[in-house]
Amino acid sequence: MKTLILLAITSLFSLSLTAAEKEAVALFNGKDFTGWTQKGGVAKYTVKDGVIVGTAVAGTPNSFMCTEKLYGDFVLEYEYLCDNRLNSGVQIRSNMFAKDTTVDLGNGKTRKIAKGRVHGYQVEIDPNKPDRMWSGGIYDEGRRGWLFPGQHGGDAARFTATGVKTYKPGKWNTVRVECRGDSIKTWLNGVPRADFKDSLTAKGFIGLQVHGIGGKKELVGAQVRWRNLVLKELK
């Protein structure tokens, strides 16, 4: 009888895990941008062999390929491969207003955000440089700047040192992001990166950034790639 009960419990546990795994969904269908829309600048986004390719163009601001659906609490995993001359990132819990809007940043501070300006938390993709390698850090795009390392903790020099050791130059790198309530955590290739609490924005879209390059002609055509974008909403 004990054996049967144990088998039943094990079976139920396995079913529970299977159900949890089924909740994870691919954000990208591998063929086209169904369910996505481009915001901000006019950098070129294409699909090649199941990979999203973002290509830098001159004279345009930061560009973002964004999910149409908004997400609050979730675990997001993806891989990226970036030209080491480029800065990029992935927006989470981000938004864009239809008109100029003044937002309360807390501590008596406000900021006017222009209509059409993508803003919100960004998981950084940094060039691999010994003086600053903050991939996996969190930058508050269009609002407060660096949060981690920065306003919410993290030693900049130590963060860079760990980043240089963890990052794989010229190869696919894996990122995991966990947003739960006011907690935001990230991992780069399995190594913990950002870990802090912030409650300014609870929900928003996911966005893939191609950073503006201004008039730097040598960066025209430089690319950043993403694949295997999988998200599991948390309840």
Predicted features, each with a name:
Residues 4-13:
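Sec-dependent N-terminal signal peptides
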